[in-house]
């Protein structure tokens, strides 16, 4: 099995996201997006709206990792936004 490179978008410099994504599009296997609601875990991070916007520049699938109290509330919005994996 070939190792996969799946960078977390939570750690990106969001002011330079287009430039960084252009580089990663040529090197990564998929993108990892953490979805946190501030309840299940204390952090609040990226959202279905971010996934929708990012999917327009991503050339690799987007994998969303749910750390939320009610995962069912996120599945359809993330799928509609362009997430390839949830």
What residue ranges belong to the model's regions?
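Conserved N-terminal beta1-alpha1 strand-loop-helix module at the mouth
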Residues: 1-85
């Amino acid at each position: 099995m070939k190792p996969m490179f799946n960078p977390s978008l939570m750690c990106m410099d969001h002011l330079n996201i287009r430039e960084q994504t252009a580089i990663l599009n040529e090197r990564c296997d998929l993108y990892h997006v953490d979805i946190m609601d501030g309840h299940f875990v204390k952090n609040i991070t990226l959202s279905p709206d971010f996934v929708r916007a990012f999917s327009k520049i991503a050339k690799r699938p987007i994998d969303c990792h749910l750390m939320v109290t009610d995962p069912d509330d996120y599945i359809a919005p993330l799928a509609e936004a362009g997430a390839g994996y949830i």
